[in-house]
Amino acid sequence: MDQEEFKRYLGKMQALCSRGEKCRADIRMKLEKTDVPQDVITQILNKLESEGFIDEHRYAGAYVRDKFRLQGWGPVKIANMLKVKKIPDRVISRALLEIGENSVLETLKDSLIKKAASVKESDPVKRRAKLTRFALSKGYTYAQIYQVLKQLQ
């Protein structure tokens, strides 16, 4: 691959990163789809990182805020999705600190109240099981779910 082609791919990736936060895994996947050689992908990723176009800490923080506030995901689901994107555990932990335990419980409570209104089950045990499964699928822990369900009774 010549220098001109490298600059073309670099420019495309810079434009992509300028539109929204991206992580190394996102850019790598995009470049691999276009059959860019691995050594060139590594060079492009390093260049983007050194120029501040990609930053794992910034990406993880934005991802946590978006998924928590907009989609109501819990910390477990957010952490798992960030791990899929190969974000280091220490970066994930630091990003998850941005959402406090109180706001996690409040969001879970709001989600469970909404869900409880749509659950038609009259048996309290089955109703509680449905709400628990729902909250687990959203990425909350058993302890958080138990705590909130206890408040709601």
Regions found by a protein language model. Give the residues of each.
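An alpha-helical, amphipathic repeat domain used for nucleic-acid recognition
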Residues: M1-Q153
